Amino acid sequence: MISLDNLTVSYGGWTLFDNISLLINPKDRIGLVGKNGAGKTTLLRLIVGEQQPTSGSISYNGECTIGYLPQQMRVADTTTLVEETAKAFDEVLKLEAEIARLTREIAERTDYESSDYELLLHRLNEATDHYHILGGDTREADIEKTLLGLGFKRSDFQRATSEFSGGWRMRIELAKLLLRRPSIFLLDEPTNHLDIESIQWLEDYLKNYNGAVLLISHDRAFLDNVTTRTVEISLGKAYDYKVPYSRYVVLRAERRAQQMAAYENQQRMIEKTEEFIEKFRYKPTKSNQVQSRIKQLDRLERIEVEEEDLATLNIKFPPAPRSGQIVAEIKEAGMSFGSKHVFSGANFTIERGDKIALVGRNGEGKTTLARMIVGQLTPTEGSIRVGANVNIGYYAQNQEDLMNGDFTVYDTLDRVAVGDVRTRLRDILGAFLFRGEDIDKKVKVLSGGERARLAMARLMLEPYNLLILDEPTNHMDMRSKDILKNAIMKYDGTVIVVSHDREFLDGMVSKVYEFRNGGVREYLGGIYYFLEKRKLESLQEVERKDAPAKEAAPKASSSGKLTYEQKKEQEKLLRKLRKAVETIEASLADLEKKIADYDRKFAEATQYNEADYKAYNELKAEYDHQMHEWEKASYELEITEGE
């Protein structure tokens, strides 16, 4: 269906891809993996035509259509949710008009035996078949099913898209993409803004999809459940494994062991050859042999091996100072923001050593409860009491903003590290993807993802006894997540984690608190015990179990009406937040254009220009910073407006 032939992508003197070839077949389910910066997103952009290779070619089956979901995109703000989603059927609407026109024309003809009449019938049949393939006759039901599957409520359908936060807007774009039914989906981190329920629904959708799927994800469970083939990008090459991710990990370890053996043998041969050359370089009787050995080294194809995996590093949190047995006591706690009721009736106790997951749809109150325990928010109902001698380490989405921008990456850790751990700072930074010259970068030039990883690395150096981690794995690759998970499992303190990553939570937590329909429910077991209890196997079951709650929920939140002044203040705040989001979006659009200009420039460049690359990296860092600000502003807007 799509053939990539000898693709090379070079930027000045640096080669990202070196003669990569790959064939994507109809109905393939491919997971694209590799270290951050290996070129996974670039490969998707090449396939979709947003970027051109330095050399090589990409060929497509004539009928191939592509549906591409990048990591960041924005939705128009001039329509309702349903109207925006229905844009997925633009081609269907054109077909409807063509079918109506052809039907009228055929009805008016009487030349039943003519070739023109036969041609009209043929075109009508083709248009009708295509209409059915694209789901034209079931589009309203498909829109509803897809939006519900991705976590929207029926009460959201007529809301303006401008009222939704950044994460929910990404879901709108994903819904449109799924409804277009292209020949192949190219999905870049599709689970980033989804909760566990929506991820499971998307898994089922993709497993049963009639086309091909090529996706990038750091969610191991998602990859295992969707893909049957894994392509690894490493050192400019593509390694194709006809197996799901977990099996690929085993085969990759075997391949790496073989590579290392070959690499070490070659290094020994090179060392002996260089010793011979140095020893006999100036002896006339050996000159022919010396020249022969020099040519041998020049012709030698050097074996490259990717840096050693860091997942085996034994990185630990410092021992937790002993706290009281009761770490936190939550009694009938609840939170509302103006007319927006988030949750109520939370009633549970967190004890020393507990490892707890907070799960549920976005906006149901997981982060709100975390901030209440930390003390950043005061409950509007009930109470929260933190126990004796509890020292909280809190990792949140904006935690990295608290770091000094003028410190280097290494200094940021060195200033809080004490004891023997100071000798291992480079290993710790490496575990969180900071290597080589990265450790000397100033914090202010780091991307949002890099700052988030640095904040987590710093958290691992300080002696807390209660860790509250809000989506800690968002900017991590598989190996970094494994390191963090192992460290948490060995940690002797108390842990509360907000996460939608099932593989990360599996085996790590022993209690799950689900935020749903304005309440909090406790499950005494791990994440898969919770999922089994909830039986989230299909959208039909989710709808059946939740139908009464969905009808009752509006009644519970409508008991307290706002005064005129309160409404006025809320509208004022909403205008301010929407303006902030619009301003940041305009800045992002400008930055995207400048970055795209540099991408084109580098693609055409024949010489390396250090000043251009410096400016390019500064633009990307600013883009990441602005995207982070956009996510924060969108979250505030979501909380204020309500879902």
PLM segments and residue spans:
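Intracellular alpha-helical coupling/juxtamembrane segments of multi-pass membrane proteins
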Residues: 251-276, 280-306
